[in-house]
């Protein structure tokens, strides 16, 4: 019904190098909005957006879901319809700031010890070693691991910006054991045993939570806790914040357009917190 509109959204989004998942989310949000308004495209106004988003807010949806709708419809109005859009009139929903869950080094060690599956153990170690997202660890390839430079190459991450992050000695040992015992994969580093393709994020989240439960961790944990813990432990060890931001692939807080990158030479001077697991 709205295929021509979706094609325009895809074309405009691709020109801006947006990820496929973002484009899909934009199209879904716009479809919900258009079905709700049931108006001709030419007759749409920002009042229609305000009514739609207000109803969504009153329905009790989360700030994250609300802002997904907001982003998709905003893109549609500004880039496709070429209509004026004032963020002061149609603001995003503010999210409650919650402190991320950070695991201690002892807790991370316990989780690793409670993970009998060698592939799963290698993935958990890799996520903590370099602060990887789940989507990043599942898409690693054999060639992304540098034994000599002790780095992990993250390709096309969430921000569509390649980066290098840290490979701890302990992680390299686990990866080496996994590689020799699990078929010496040369393509995808952690392929699905069933399909040979990339593992799903849900499967990684599930086995991590099972390992945390076996380890007796009482905190509410997710795989993202490993990323938070990586950053927190580096900061505690005195690592410069700008290097932590670069290792995580975050944008510079002073500019949403510029990324901070760390050279391989600089990486050689930073130790992964996994290499400090000898004590708290």
Where do the protein language model's features map onto the residues?
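Conserved catalytic core of the tyrosine transesterase superfamily
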Residues: 1-280
